[in-house]
Amino acid sequence: MIRVYNYASYHIEAIEKIGLARINCADGPVGWACFMDKTRFYDTCSFCSQTLVATSWNKDIANRFGKTVGDEGIIGNEKGDKSPYSGWYAPGVNIHRSPFGGRNFEYYSEDGMLSGIMAAEQIKGCNSKGVFTFVKHFAVNEQETHRSISGDSSYLT
């Protein structure tokens, strides 16, 4: 378990005892991304921000966004090690509490209801393609400055 936890950056380690194969995961509410290695993603799109999706008030658009990300997860690593991306570190569901929020582009709206509805549709779309999601940043992620000094924000969200 220590190995699974300590070495699980952007993937889930294989656990032979229970028959779990290694699973590739990636970040990016606006598409597949990895700030640690910018060359990991081939032929995948950068999408619009979550805020723009929410301004449409259109659940179908959010669902299609999720489906497209799911499709890209399956084929997006074909020029890399040929392993699909099965887990997506998104969507971000915090709300816009301040215009100075460092990650507002990752969140849908200041309206919690709208944010939840749009996130649910995006998740349904992505899951329908066999890619699971890690809903992130429920709260306590209002700034980027000094965010990692204590590390609490990352674990709480």
Named regions from a protein language model:
Residues 1-157:
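Glycoside hydrolase catalytic-domain context in secreted enzymes
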